[in-house]
A protein has these predicted regions:
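Hydrophobic alpha-helical elements and their junctions with loops/disorder across both membrane
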Residues: 18-19, 60, 200
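Membrane-proximal, proline-rich intrinsically disordered regions
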Residues: 22-85
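Sec-dependent bacterial lipoprotein signal peptides
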Residues: 1-20
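Intrinsically disordered, low-complexity, compositionally biased regions/tails
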Residues: 16, 32-34, 276-278
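Long, intrinsically disordered, low-complexity segments
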Residues: 20-24, 281-284
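Structured, solvent-exposed acidic/aromatic patches
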Residues: 40-44, 90-284
Length: 284
């Protein structure tokens, strides 16, 4: 009799565990809290990363950032490329005149250019890549690819070889790609991104609209921007590789949506994604 009771008790425990296992996930889910799946569907999970990447293409901040972003832009770009191009002149005498504006390069200023044009957006790009693969949202990763190339082509043109084709991989040492390899990879990535977003644009779809501070999720405008970026890269390599340059220049110009041709196409950040941005040049 004692053994029979033990078997009954054991059977009851097993049955109870089966019922509780069925309800475990439901019982342990907060009905008032957003799940990961909901976050992806609404763009919350990657939306912040998209905005962060946009703010890193050309360093830009808000009032909440005080002058941090302005100072970063000044050191990374204004005291180097902006000045060397002849668009701006400086009225300060940093390092007793031995600074980038007099072609005496300061290591910390050069490092700031690399950090702001390459390193800053890497973590956001990796997050979008991982999430888009898990949730099968290639259109969001396509946007991230366009933003990445918008920033990294400046690094490539300023420093030469950069880690590109293996960037973001979990390895102790990431190899650098030659300029030719990096440019070709950028063309390939841009082509893939444009193809994906073109389909979405033809469907009239928007993506991460609440977090896109540039075009508010307008996929058609992103395609035109990406085509314009492709044309710009093609012109950059025209003397080094005329055949490749012609191929991608024609591809950009002959695309259904073409390139940017009017003021309404411009990619600028003044207000968007719930923020008001400061114009670095006005403050400098």
């Amino acid at each position: 009799m004692k053994k029979i009771n033990q078997y009954k008790l054991l059977a009851g425990i097993c049955a109870l565990s089966l019922f509780t296992a069925c309800d475990f996930e439901e019982l342990n889910t907060n009905p008032f809290e957003m799940t990961d799946e909901m976050g992806i569907r609404d763009g919350v999970a990657v939306g912040g990363a998209v905005t962060a990447m946009q703010r890193a293409v050309v360093t830009v901040g808000t009032q909440a950032d005080d002058t941090e972003a302005i100072n970063q832009y000044q050191v990374a770009y204004n005291l180097s490329a902006d000045s060397w191009s002849g668009f701006f002149g400086q009225n300060n005498n940093w390092y007793s005149g031995s600074n980038n504006t007099t072609y005496y390069l300061q290591d910390n200023w050069v490092a700031a250019t690399y950090t702001n044009s390459y390193t800053t957006l890497l973590s956001s790009w990796k997050k979008i890549k991982q999430e888009s693969e898990k949730t099968e949202t290639p259109e969001i990763f396509a946007l991230a690819q366009i933003l990445k190339i918008s920033a990294w082509h400046k690094t490539l043109e300023s420093f030469g070889p950069i880690p590109y084709t293996h960037a973001g991989e979990p390895a102790l040492v990431i190899p650098f790609d030659s300029e030719q390899v990096a440019f070709n990879a950028m063309f390939t990535d841009l082509t893939a991104a444009i193809d994906i977003l073109t389909v979405r644009a033809e469907q009239g779809a928007t993506i991460v609209a609440d977090y896109d501070a540039v075009y508010a999720g307008d996929t058609r405008k992103w395609v035109k921007y990406a085509n314009s970026l492709m044309l710009r890269l093609a012109m950059r390599i025209s003397y080094a590789d005329e055949t490749t340059a012609q191929k991608y220049a024609r591809q950009a110009l002959n695309h259904t949506f073409g390139v940017m041709t009017s003021k309404s196409d411009e990619a600028q950040m003044s207000t968007g994604a719930g923020m008001v941005f400061r114009n670095n040049i006005e403050w400098l």
